[in-house]
């Protein structure tokens, strides 16, 4: 015969109606219902009237309730060996088979029927256990997810920390290297200044030594002449008169020739003490600038009047327009031309020889700026220029324009672009070791910037001199490394 009930369902049917646990020492009442021996005795003790079966409410005699041996054997067969003994209620000595949802504590069946938990919602321990196991599993799952997130965060923090330390080490190495090179340059300038002072001093001292030697020789000769004259002072009248007439005038004339022979010399090393730091800083500033760029002009951007030569490094405004294709890149109104290479990051320095031109402009322009029609010379239109007008007015094309107090007429202009810092600086570069600041634009550069030269109108030949992009030359320059990114 096949079983129609599973073991879990069978266990549910073998529960005591009082404690809702599997029967312990089951006793059978006259009505046929069975109860745990402990539950039945507890009911009998706590009832003043006749005992009624909690299931069918029939009056029964608990004293004549025999053990339900068959039920006990079934329960014994279902029980696993080694199952722990259930905990018991301290009040009724019955197994803790129920859980009070209100008070959140374990109780026995009598506590739920007769005790302080009589009207509370109670749940079998097995059900509560299953529910709590599910809640615990869900909590563990949530905790594992949170743990995974925290582990990922820890890994990111560790990687971030490692990256910061590595970048710091690299940047510290760069700083040490740069300062070593700066110290080397400072030592070179120090040696140069000292050598200049010492060389100047050697020349002055040599001149003074020569004068001193001449003066001491004259001093000795005068002493000898004086001694000789004093000796003749003791001669007879005739001898004295004879010598005086021939020698004294000659000795006196020689003494007069020595008067004014000494010329005082002042120590002028060409470097004032108060200007040492400024002078050295100017020299160092030139050396720490990036190495000059080797630029060429782009013929496809040149205005038709412009003539390019010497490998596209020289441009001048001609009298006749050149036959050139009309291209979007070409200027058709302003006499401008761009360099063939632009810059969208980093630090760059280049120079432009303007010579004795009476009118010129130079600077940088955004690659997207319009090249058709009159050039809008202002930062708002992506153009940053300085220039000379009518051979006497230097100006920066900002808004509004700014006149520049330029001393003299620079023939060579230096341009320094620091893209990330948004700085475009112009210098008088006639003296390589003494760059003189002309003007600095501050801007938030976007996109590629191109060096631009504007020769201006030739003025019927009076402004036809060329502008030149010179090849880099001269002493080596310290080229600082690009800064590292955190």
UniProtKB/Swiss-Prot annotation:
Keyword field: Acetylation, Coiled coil, Cytoplasm, Metal-binding, Transferase, Ubl conjugation, Ubl conjugation pathway, Zinc, Zinc-finger
Catalytic reaction equation(s): S-ubiquitinyl-[E2 ubiquitin-conjugating enzyme]-L-cysteine + [acceptor protein]-L-lysine = [E2 ubiquitin-conjugating enzyme]-L-cysteine + N(6)-ubiquitinyl-[acceptor protein]-L-lysine
Claim: Nucleus is one of the keywords in the record: no
Source species, domain of life: Eukaryota
GO biological process, alphabetically ordered: innate immune response
Primary residence: cytoplasm
CDD domains: Bbox2_TRIM50-like, RING-HC_TRIM50_like_C-IV, SPRY_PRY_TRIM50
Zinc finger (RING-type): 16-57
GO MF annotation: an example: ubiquitin protein ligase activity
Annotated EC: 2.3.2.27
SMART domains, per the entry: BBOX, PRY, RING, SPRY
Subcellular location field: Cytoplasm
Keyword Ubl conjugation: yes
Coiled coil: 125-170, 204-235
Chain positions recorded as Zn(2+) binding sites: 89, 92, 111, 117
PTM entry text: Auto-ubiquitinated.
Gene Ontology CC annotation, any one: cytoplasm
Classification via Pfam families: PRY (PF13765), SPRY (PF00622), zf-B_box (PF00643), zf-RING_UBOX (PF13445)
Modified residues (N6-acetyllysine): 372
Zinc finger motifs (B box-type), residue ranges: 84-125
Quaternary context: Can form dimers and trimers. Interacts with several E2 ubiquitin-conjugating enzymes, including UBE2L6, UBE2E1, UBE2E3. No interaction with UBE2H. Interacts with BECN1. Interacts with SQSTM1. Interacts with NLRP3.
Family listed: Belongs to the TRIM/RBCC family.
Biological role stated in the UniProt entry: E3 ubiquitin-protein ligase that ubiquitinates Beclin-1/BECN1 in a 'Lys-63'-dependent manner enhancing its binding to ULK1. In turn, promotes starvation-induced autophagy activation. Also interacts with p62/SQSTM1 protein and thereby induces the formation and the autophagy clearance of aggresome-associated polyubiquitinated proteins through HDAC6 interaction. Also promotes NLRP3 inflammasome activation by directly inducing NLRP3 oligomerization independent of its E3 ligase function.
Protein known as: E3 ubiquitin-protein ligase TRIM50
Organism name: Sus scrofa
């Amino acid at each position: 015969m096949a079983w129609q009930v599973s073991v879990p369902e069978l266990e549910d049917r073998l529960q005591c109606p009082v404690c809702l646990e599997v029967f312990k020492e089951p006793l059978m009442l006259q009505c046929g219902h069975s109860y745990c021996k402990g539950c039945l005795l507890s009911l009998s003790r706590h009832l003043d009237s006749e005992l009624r079966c909690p299931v069918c409410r029939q009056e029964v005699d608990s004293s004549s309730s025999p053990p339900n041996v068959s039920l006990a054997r079934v329960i014994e067969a279902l029980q696993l060996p080694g199952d722990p003994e259930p905990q018991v209620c301290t009040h009724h000595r019955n197994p803790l088979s129920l859980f009070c949802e209100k008070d959140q504590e374990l109780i026995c069946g009598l506590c739920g029927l007769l005790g302080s938990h009589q009207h509370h919602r109670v749940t079998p321990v097995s059900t509560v256990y299953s529910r709590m196991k599910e809640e615990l599993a869900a909590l563990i799952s949530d905790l594992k997810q949170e743990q995974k997130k925290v582990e990922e965060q820890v890994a990111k923090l560790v990687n971030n920390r490692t990256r910061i330390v590595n970048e710091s080490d690299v940047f510290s190495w760069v700083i040490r290297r740069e300062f070593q090179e700066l110290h080397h340059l400072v030592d070179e300038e120090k040696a140069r200044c000292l050598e200049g002072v010492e060389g100047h001093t050697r020349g002055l001292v040599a001149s003074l030594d020569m004068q001193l030697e001449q003066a001491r020789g004259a001093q000795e000769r005068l002493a000898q002449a004086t001694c000789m004259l004093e000796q003749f002072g003791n001669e007879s009248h005739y001898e004295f008169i004879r010598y005086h007439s021939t020698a004294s005038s000659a000795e006196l004339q020689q003494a007069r020739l020595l008067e004014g022979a000494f010329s005082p010399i002042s120590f002028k090393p060409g470097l004032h003490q108060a200007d040492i730091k400024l002078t050295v800083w100017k020299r160092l500033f030139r050396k720490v600038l990036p190495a000059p760029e080797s630029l060429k002009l782009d013929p496809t951007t040149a205005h038709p009047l412009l003539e390019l030569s010497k490998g596209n490094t020289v441009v001048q405004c001609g009298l006749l327009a050149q036959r050139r294709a009309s291209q979007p890149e070409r200027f058709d109104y302003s006499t401008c031309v761009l360099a063939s290479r632009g810059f969208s990051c980093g630090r760059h320095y280049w120079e432009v020889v303007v010579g004795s031109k009476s009118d010129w402009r130079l600077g940088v322009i955004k690659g997207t700026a319009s090249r058709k029609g009159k050039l809008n010379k202002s930062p708002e239109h992506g153009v940053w220029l300085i220039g000379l007008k009518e051979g006497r007015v230097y100006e920066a094309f900002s808004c509004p324009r700014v006149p520049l107090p330029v001393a003299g007429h620079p023939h060579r202009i230096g341009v320094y672009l620091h893209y990330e810092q948004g700085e475009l600086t112009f210098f008088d570069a006639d003296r390589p070791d003494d760059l003189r600041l002309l003007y600095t634009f501050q801007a938030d550069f976007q996109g590629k910037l191109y060096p631009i030269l504007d020769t201006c109108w030739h003025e019927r030949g009076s402004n036809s001199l060329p502008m030149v992009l010179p090849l880099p030359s001269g002493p080596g320059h310290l080229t600082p490394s690009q800064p590292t990114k955190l």
